[in-house]
Regions:
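A cross-taxon signal for low-complexity, glycine/charged-rich
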Residues: 4-12
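Bacterial N-terminal signal peptides
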Residues: 28-39
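Bacterial N-terminal signal peptides that target proteins for export
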Residues: 16-29
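Second-shell loop/turn segments in exported
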Residues: 166-170, 179-188
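A contiguous strand-loop segment
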Residues: 49-176, 197-213, 218-368
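Histidine-centered catalytic/metal-binding microenvironments
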Residues: 517-581
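Substrate-recognition/cap regions that form aromatic- and gly/pro-loop-enriched pockets
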Residues: 403-532
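Boundary at the C-terminal end of the N-terminal hydrophobic targeting segment
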Residues: 42-47
Length: 581
């Protein structure tokens, strides 16, 4: 079953709309501007106010999926997309574990920058080490370990009074969310264990935002999914003060539900008598002390409203798209699709419904698959008022004096090209960085049951490759990326190169992408039963042999993805450059 989110662009026919013919040369001028300014396509201008919009998380309980898997997922805009296996280790009693600043960075303007693989940044503190750690996959925001524990992360907004900025030697808080994720993956087997450990770490050592906001995590294991939301407590906090160094709350996702986090906290009312809720002791007290909530008012305490600013359209639109797609009959959703009974509004002027309109989670009307999650992650809001490729600015004169969509039409135009053509910008779900879908299956041994469907760069263009939880290594192509130095031996650079070439003639070139990528990716899915049957047979005789088989297969597949993108790059260069007219 598919929710139809992966239909390729480029089928737009003629449209009877008036247009000034001066737009035609403007398109070519805009394309020239895109070529010059493409490296800055995903970054905001200096001094612009930015709110978190880079991460979309989807979590799904086991009774809502096609085969009983549990899913958590993550699309991320972080530049630290390199993935490598950190093996489990043993330590002496009394050893200390370093706490780092600099695991993540966000492009050229971030002074944290790219570090050598395995260097996790400046050590700003220590916590007690455990005697044995588990193997996990390390990325900017590490996401999965050998025991099928997986975490999706989404930075959220918080009220400015809660903000904490890192100043070496001054800031007392030391625990970033990405560091807490690493500790959880190294030390925990279940979602509940991870939730409680992360909550304890941010309370004890102080939550230090690395992206300037609060954080939401979708933590999953083969049995259940939890959402954990964390706010900082401002720069005045002191360790040892007896006050928690963070404000946090958590809610369990019903087993037959799907939850979305779109850079905005999702929990509203908290009922600590219900075992599906957990929270810090100060979850309400901080709001009372700061004058943000009056217990005598008679109004219920709403977590979301107490600590977060008003939700923005870029957050709402993702909630709307996914919830209205998987649960269309749940309620009267805003009409924002361009087909059927479309809305009289456009993204230039419409009523926004507010965060309270959306439930914490929804029960999908059809069972969800890995491919469905991938489809949402690749979404550019096709067929909706947010579809930037549907903007009339792309229309050019065609045969018989009819207006047709320019071959340059793309949902991923650079900021300069959008300014030139006066295209209203909107945040797509697909965004540059890296991401994953974690598929967790309790009926299989951990090394086989957990699959880390991983991509780099833009998921709309990239290929998802399955990495099994028990593998001992990954392809060197996926361990290599430096934004300041191009490399043929970097998966991220190869995908990015292809994406830039697609813009030479997007409407035609994207068909070449599908022709090259889709059969390879589909092969990963169709061969899954055979691969896992063989791995399970090996595991029953010798678990080490199963791990070796899956490691070799995973590395080979990751290499095949890079080879495919190299070949596609060569095709696009020869087909859409040179002597074309």
């Amino acid at each position: 079953m598919s929710f139809g989110m992966t239909a390729p662009l480029g089928k737009g026919g003629s449209r009877e709309r008036g247009m000034n013919n001066k737009r035609v040369p403007m398109l070519w001028l805009g394309f020239a501007a895109w070529i010059v300014l493409a490296p800055a396509a995903a970054s905001a201008g200096a001094g612009e106010e930015r709110s978190p919009e880079g991460c979309t998380v989807i979590g799904v309980g086991r009774l809502a999926t096609v085969d009983g898997s549990v899913f958590t997922s993550h699309t991320d805009c972080c530049s630290e997309c390199r993935v490598h296996v950190v093996p489990g280790r043993t330590f002496k009693k009394g050893d200390l574990a370093p706490v780092h600043w600099g695991m993540v960075y966000f492009g050229r303007d971030d002074d944290r920058g790219c570090l050598p693989l395995g260097d996790y940044g400046k050590v700003i503190g220590h916590i007690p080490q455990v005697e044995k750690t588990f193997s996990y996959f390390h990325t900017g925001y590490s996401q999965m370990n050998e025991h099928q524990l997986a975490i999706g992360e989404s930075t959220c907004s918080q009220k400015p009074a809660l903000d904490v900025a890192f100043m070496e030697g001054v800031t007392k808080q030391i625990m970033t969310i990405e560091q807490a994720q690493v500790f959880a993956l190294e030390r925990c087997r279940t979602a509940r264990e991870a939730l409680k450990l992360i909550a304890s770490l941010v309370e004890t050592y102080g939550f230090l935002p690395s992206c300037g906001g609060s954080e939401a995590l979708c933590i999953a294991d083969p049995k259940e999914v939890w959402v954990l939301e964390v706010f900082s407590v401002g720069p005045e906090w002191e360790p040892g003060s007896g006050k928690p160094g963070a404000i946090w709350a958590a809610r369990r996702v019903p087993d037959d539900h799907l939850v979305v986090i779109s850079n905005y906290v999702r929990i509203r009312e908290i009922d600590l008598k219900d075992p599906d809720f957990l929270a810090s002791t100060n979850y309400m007290r901080e709001a009372v002390d700061r004058g943000w909530y009056d217990p005598k008012s008679g109004r219920p305490f709403i977590w979301q409203e107490a600590y977060a600013p008003r939700i923005k359209e870029g957050n709402l639109s993702r909630l709307w798209l996914i919830y209205s797609t998987v649960a269309p009959s749940l309620k009267e959703w805003p009409r924002r699709r361009l087909t059927g009974s479309s809305s009289p509004f456009t993204m230039y002027g419409q009523d926004l419904e507010g965060a309270a309109f959306y439930p914490f989670s929804v029960k999908p009307e059809k069972k969800i698959s890995v491919k469905d999650i991938i489809g949402f992650q690749r979404s550019a809001f096709e067929g909706t008022i947010y579809d930037m490729a549907a903007d009339p600015a792309w229309l050019v004169p065609g045969p018989q004096d009819r207006l047709v969509k320019s071959l340059l039409t793309t949902p991923f135009a650079s900021p300069e090209l959008k300014r030139l053509l006066r295209i209203a910008s909107h945040r797509t779900i697909a965004t540059q960085g890296y991401g994953m879908v974690a598929q967790l299956r309790g009926w299989l041994p951990d090394p086989i049951g957990g699959i880390y469907w991983f991509y780099v760069d833009n998921p709309y263009v990239s290929a998802y490759v399955p990495i099994y939880a028990g593998v001992l290594d990954v392809s060197p192509f996926y361990k290599n990326y430096d934004y300041a130095r191009f490399s043929e031996d970097s998966a991220r650079w190869m995908v990015d190169f292809v994406e830039k070439l697609l813009h030479l003639r997007w409407q035609e070139a994207v068909k070449d992408l599908h022709a090259a990528r889709d059969p390879l990716e589909e092969g990963f899915f169709t061969s899954q039963p055979e691969v896992e049957a063989k791995a399970l047979k090996l595991h029953e005789k010798n678990p080490a042999e199963a791990v070796k088989y899956l490691t070799d297969l995973t590395i080979s597949r990751m290499n095949d993805v890079v080879k495919m993108f190299r070949s596609l790059r060569d095709l696009l260069l020869t087909k859409y450059t040179g002597d074309i007219v």
